[in-house]
Amino acid sequence: MTKDLQKRTLFAVLALAIFLPVLFAGGLLLQIGIGLLAMLGVHELLHMKGLKTMTIEGALTLFATFALTIPLENYLTFLPVDGNVVAYSVLITIMLGTTVFSKNYTIEDAAFPIAVSFYVGLGFNALLDARVAGFDKVLLALFIVWATDSAAYLTGMNFGKHKLAPRVSPNKSIEGFVGGILGAVLITVVFMLVDSTVALPYGIYRMSLFAAFFSVAGQFGDLIESAMKRHFGVKDSGKFIPGHGGVLDRFDSMLIVFPMMHLFGLF
């Protein structure tokens, strides 16, 4: 077993031991924890671009991310529309409003923080929506992501000969990409044999096709983050997890997979 694979395995074990009990419990603790993870992910992206979070604009970006992530509709019940939409829109409007009164903060400056708050906040919000729908649905998504990552890594390491996206991620191969898809389909079939109700109203054959799509989406999410890191000239998104980089290095695929599963009506 290579050192990199040992690190991946160790992280997976620790993540399962810490994250899964909180995920299983759900509720406010999970919502706050995921909201803080989302804020940390946006902090990493702002830091990549050289933007400071200890500013009015930076704070607004972090609060907007938190507002989009947690299910505010459960707490702002007096509003006639979704609480997330209202809170996020208000904070983004304030952020745009600062461009009116500041000579050094333009619409172009505001565009990147707004984009990353939406990208990260929407992904983590979908994770919380999945948990509300059922613990098994979150597990299915996580297993698809982890199976894709592990199968792609092992297949690419042993059989990878053709580069997938050399400009963005030189180490990824087409063989690994295909291996990741097969790994996701296999874990989905096994999961549904154990829990046949997780993907209702879809059966195992259609879910196998969906799993292939989710695997592609997850690997695309990985490439998106790789492209951003290469653009900004950094190796990792952050240093939150020693030896593993930042939050986005671990959650990049999930930020795409969870919204896609929601789009397909799985929760």
What are these regions (language model features)?
Residues 228-229, 252-261:
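C-terminal transmembrane helix pair
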